[in-house]
Every structure is written in C-alpha cells, then in structure tokens.
Amino acid sequence: MNTAYRKPLPGTSLDYFDARAAVDAIAPGAYDTLPYTSRVLAENLVRRCDPAILADSLKQIIERKRERDFPWFPARVVCHDILGQTALVDLAGLRDAIAERGGDPAKVNPVVPVQLIVDHSLAVECGGFDPDAFAKNRAIEDRRNEDRFHFIEWTKQSFENVDVIPPGNGIMHQINLEKMSPVIQAQDGVAYPDTCVGTDSHTPHVDALGVIAIGVGGLEAENVMLGRASWMRLPDIVGVELTGKRQPGITATDVVLALTEFLRKEKVVGAYLEFRGAGAASLTLGDRATISNMAPEYGATAAMFFIDGQTTDYLRLTGRSDEQVTLVETYAKQAGLWADTLDHAQYERTLTFDLSSVVRNMAGPSNPHKRLPTSDLAARGIAGQWEEKAGEMPDGAVIIAAITSCTNTSNPRNVIAAALLARNANARGLTRKPWVKSSLAPGSKAVELYLEEANLLPELEKLGFGIVAFACTTCNGMSGALDPKIQQEIVDRDLYATAVLSGNRNFDGRIHPYAKQAFLASPPLVVAYAIVGTIRFDIEKDVLGHDQDGKPVTLKDIWPTDEEIDAIVASSVKPEQFRKVYEPMFARVADAGERAAPLYDWRAQSTYIRRPPYWEGALAGERTLKGMRPLAVLGDNITTDHLSPSNAILANSAAGEYLAKMGLPEEDFNSYATHRGDHLTAQRATFANPTLINEMAIVDGAVKKGSLARVEPDGTVMRMWEAIETYMNRKQPLIVIAGADYGQGSSRDWAAKGVRLAGVEVIVAEGFERIHRTNLIGMGVLPLEFKPGTNRTTLGIDGTETFDVVGARTPRADLTLVIHRRNGERVAVPVTCRLDTAEEVSIYDAGGVLQRFAQDFLESSQAA
C-alpha cells in the first residue's frame, strides 16, 4: 500500500509503518502533539489506506477536522455467543441467499479474524452454596443450548477465519485482556498496533492495554468481518488527567463508579477518553481495566490508557512470552505509543479528576451513573428502619448477591479483597442470610487457581460464594431461578426485593424479574450484603452481627487492609496459572477438525437457530416513508433492555406462549438472549420489557406500564406483540417517537432487528446512543433527530397521527417530518437525518448491511 513509509523496526526482524514520518511530512512536528488515539488511527491509515486519499485523511487527524470520513481497518473481531452467533446465523443465511442466486456460498467467509467466546448462555440455576453448582449449571447450559452449540460448532468447521472458545472457559473481555490481545500484532513481517471491534459494549475493557477496542452492534461487526472498512470521522478525543492516589480501603470499583458519575456530568458521550497523569500511572493494569470496562456507562466510545511499565508487567504476569513483551515495548517506544512520549499531546478538552477524593461507593438504584456513597445510605433513603422477623424476609431483601462480571473479576485486587473479607467474616462467626442467592462467577479460570494458591477459595465457599460458572451470568441477566418459596413470598407480600452485584449495569428488571431494583458494588461489599441480607442495612454504621463472644461486628472490623491485599496478590497471582489455563484452551481452538459443508442444514423445529428472513417477504419489498403510524411514543433513556430484553422468558409472555406451542417445557424456556438466532422467537421480545412506558398505552385515563401498545385508528390497547401482528397483517408502515438517549445500554442488534421486522421504518428521537444508531442503519431503519427545543411534548404527539418523511437522504441532511393530525391539521417539522456518513447512506439505501453485501458479492462474481 503506502510502501514508502514501511521501515525496519529497530532491534527486530520486523518492519513497521512510520506514521510519524507520514504526519510530519504534511505538518512538521505535528505528530508530537497528537493524542494516543490519533497516533494509532494515523498508523492504520498509513498501513491500510488507499494512497489516493491518504493525505486528505491524515489532514483530518492533524488539523482536528471532521469534514470527511476516513477508513479504519480493525485487526480483529471479537464476539460473545449471543451477538456472535446471530452474526454467523446472518452469514449462514447470506450463503443460502448467494447460492439461490447462483453464487458460490463457500466464498462467503469472514475476511478479518473472528474470535467467538461462548459466555452469555449460562444461567445460575444453582447458587454458590451448592458444592456441585458449576457442574450442574454447565449441564443445564448444554442441555438448553444444544441447538445453538451445534450451530456454533458448524461455524467453526465451515467458515474460514473463525475461532471458537467453547462454554465454561470465561468471559470474552477477560480472555481478550489476559490472552487474546497481543497489544502489538506481528503479521506478514510487519508489526502494528492491535485494534478490534467487539459485539458487546464493554469491548473497551482492553483499552486498558493501550488497544483501541470499541463495542459495535452485530450488524456493524458483520460489515467488518466481511472485509469492509469501518468508516468514521475523527472522534472527540478528551484527555482525563488523574491526580492523587486512592485513599486506604478504596477499591477500583469505588473509583470507576465515581468516575462514571463525573464523566456523565461532563458529557463525554461518543468521545475517546485518554487517561493520563501521575494518578493514571499509579494504577495497576487490573484497576485500569475496571475503569476502561465501564466506558459505555459513562457514555464514552473508548477509554484509553497509554502503554507503560504497568502494561508490560501485566503482560508478563498473564503469561505472554518474553519475545512478545519485548516487541510491545520496542514498538511502543519507536512509534510514540509509550507513555512518556505523549507528554506534549494536545486535546480539545482536558478534564481533571482527583483519585484521593473517592470514597466507598455503590451505584443505584436503576442506573450505573447514579453514585451512592455508602456513608449516605440513610440520607438517600436507601438504608432505613427494618426488622427481621423469624421465617420472613425483610423489606429490601437482597435476594441476589453476585460476584460477577469481567469489570471486577479481571482485577485480582478486587477478588482477593472479597475473599479476605469472607475469611474475616467466617472467623467472627458471620453467615449468609438464607434468602440470599449468592454466587461467584469469575471471567477467567485463572481466578480459581490464584484463590486456591492463596487458600482463600474455601473461605468464599463457606459463605455461599462457591464458583458457579466461568461466564457472564448475573451481570447480563442470567441470574437463574429463585427458590420457589422465596419467589412466592415476594409475590404474596409484594416485597421490595433487590440484587447487589459487582457488575456494570443495574437497569430495572435486568438482573431478575423479581428483583425490583439492583445496586452495583465492589466484590467485598457484595459479600457484606449477603451477610446482612437487606439493602435497608446501613453498611458503614450498623452491626453486621455478633461474634462467638457476643461482640458486635461492623464492616470496618472485617475489611482487609490494602497491605494484606497487595501482599497476597503479589504472592498468589502467577504467570504459570495463566499459561496453565490458556495454553491448552487455545491449542484446542487451533484444531478446527474436518471442514463442514458450506450450507447449514437448518433444523425446522428449532427455537434457537432459524434461517433469517432478511432477503425475502416484507423486507424484500418496496419501502415507504408515508402514512406511518406510531407503534410507540416513548420518553427519555430508552435502553436496549426495553427494546429487546435479555433475561428469563416468562410463561405468560408472547415468547413464552410461542415456546410452549413449540413443545418446550417452561423450565427450558431459557433467556431471550439465547433465542436470538431464531427470529420467530426473538421478534416476540420486541418491546417486551415489563417496565416499558409507552405513552400511547392509556388505560382508565392513565398511562399503564408494561409491554403494551395502542392500535390505531381503532384506539385499542393490547399487548405489544399482538399490536405488531395486527399491523403486520395490515401491512402498515410504522414509526417510533422517542426522547433523549434512545438505545443506550448493550450493543444488541435485535433491538434494531425486532423493530425492523415489526415494520418500523423510522425512529425519531431527541438523541441516539452510537451503537444502536448504527444497528438501526444496518437493518435499514432511518434514524431522525429532532432539532433542539423540539420534541414529542412540544409537538403534542399523542399517537393518533400519521407521519411522512420528505427530503433527500444525505449525510446529516435536514429532512421534513410531516405530521397529519386526526383533525386534518398538517404540521411540517424539520429533523436531522442521522445517516452521518456516505457509507451509512449506502447501507441504508441498500436495505441494510446484509442486503448490500449480497448485491456487491453477486456483482463482483459476475464481473469476474
């Protein structure tokens, strides 16, 4: 490509592409002022960009302009089994479509390496107090997901460039951090920065290593898999200067929850953050990963740390080879990615955050950016009066206490802190409350090894925190069934029940249908709440219990010291543990076995895997942006959990009724997430969240919460799925009207697929979350944005209207939303077309990512 900039990398047998020379040739001295992100993007352009547009693309970075799109070519795609599987189902369906049109299906393969980790499908049916919980939960997972795992095994053997980590081995982001990311790639004699996109919003976990890794929707991931560039405009790059040091007893969880609140207020949505300064340098890689992981919770696209000695120490600790560690340091220093080469980097905005200001924190209820200092529990109305009656759960009962999520279990300090608190509690005779479903689900098998090395796993097990899985579990809503007696008591007494978890999201209804609210906390606090059993407990002030001598025990009495935590981490976490876990795991991955047939033999009765419908039926017909009726009128902060929930399927839901008709017993309904490879089940999850507030669903004069819609012009309120079926039968084009921050949360492609299959042509909102907006475009749904000061309320939209969209769809063009009111009034409202790039216009005009690829593939085949 741009071979003039290919040069030998000193001290190695490899070459590299000299982005500094390319940038300084345009603007002498400019490279030294570029932020870390810009340097990595510049290298990607110099190595991969068409020479004809290289100079203009680099000028966008050098001059901090956002006037034109430039290409970005990620080195890898990482997927979990839910979105990864649905992406591969789409590619399998694409092979069918290509074959039916006379093309060669075997030529449809990912061009970019794809790593799929099965981590989202295990539910914690057996809690950590069952010594056989891990084996039982895995057996249930295999039984429930046989169809899915059969398909995933076929993809490994049929597609090129697809590696699969089977279930029971850990969480995608933690494996990416501990093993899969080399930080610096070496391929075809060239060294270059590792970059990746992942089908999960927490993909920035490995930004802690200095790797640009961003979450994308499944549809955008498919686009990258198939070899297309990810076109972008220069993002807002914000410097975050970390000063000071943590106070004693403060965990990385406390820090990230404080940062999440701070950064939300600073409005960093969509930005690439670069954490720098003495405070950043003092953080371990595990602490950095906890911070980077929660980028989507504070709204950022990426959360970068620079490569430095902490990075190389971590690479050694996790068993990377000496040669790889040396390459990382050599390349980073040569290419200006080492921390001390970025002293003169300039930012459009720099924020300052003092680590010493952080206190012990939780977050909640309902939002991860709703910081809750543990010293303010009573003042905030969380802690309060409660009484424990024999045989009854208290108000605010903690029914789930889960040490879960890569956010915290990839940080040895957090895990060891929880284990030491458990040890101290056991020594004082404290126990878990019987109604608390406790669990430990690390994101890596290495966690088990270092807990055993420290002789601390038995201490966690004694309190009910035995290992239930190496998977996402409770963090992504797979908390499993409650004890039937506990569930019945919650229903009979209409009890306010809660969950406390070391995860990254706590939206209402996400963790468990019967946990009305959830709170995020550090792993040691999770253990403490399992002991007290209610969120009404003032964790800093109240007495947890009494020891064998009758002496009161408080949290400070059992909280471990930083010195002890650090000493045990230093003595118990070892490189050989990571090698023992990952060397055999990746040896098995490399052995894909015999090649399978290029076309999948779809199972007609499967409710998990079904040939997708995107090239046939209504989606293949003419589209219209006229006469659209609203399916829903929604407020602010609609999440992808509202749009397409992931948690357990209940028997009285539309999906539950369908599965029962298909012959599945209720105990094997599984979660909505696991059925996303079957559109007939998955589309019944559209707007199926019981906490949805559709402002059109007015019953007895008031808006009724639930999965409800009002069919117009009839005016009948009914269940959302029945309304969708009614409109589908009428071939009625639909629109959704919404408030600010539409589509926040998980990077869930079915949040877009579901509305498209329902017949929704347009979403008009006050603002969109980045990943969901690209997913809508990838499905051929048009995102439009109200102008500031205009919204559904100022326009008096009540759902009886019909809507047209008028105007030429070009990047960020002004279009007209025409409202036809029931009384005959016509109102024209200017809106912004949120097709932001020419590439997005091309995808939308083709009907979506897959439709465009099929067209392009057949055209190129015919030309050849």
Identify what each model region corresponds to.
Residues 1-139, 283-293, 297-321, 604-644, ...:
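N-terminal amphipathic, basic-rich helices that act as targeting or association modules
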Residues 37, 184-329, 338, 422-434, ...:
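Mobile "lid/hinge" segments at catalytic clefts and subdomain interfaces of large enzymes
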Residues 50-242, 254-257, 360-363, 377-471, ...:
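Long, structured ligand/cofactor-binding scaffold of large enzymes
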Residues 73, 92-147, 280-385, 540-601, ...:
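Terminal amphipathic helices with adjacent charged low-complexity linkers/tails
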Residues 243, 272, 276-283, 504, ...:
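Extracellular/luminal Protease-associated
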Residues 547-562, 568, 772-843:
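Acidic, glycine-rich flexible loop/linker segments
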Residues 674-675, 683-717, 725-729, 784, ...:
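NTP/phosphate- and nucleic-acid-binding module
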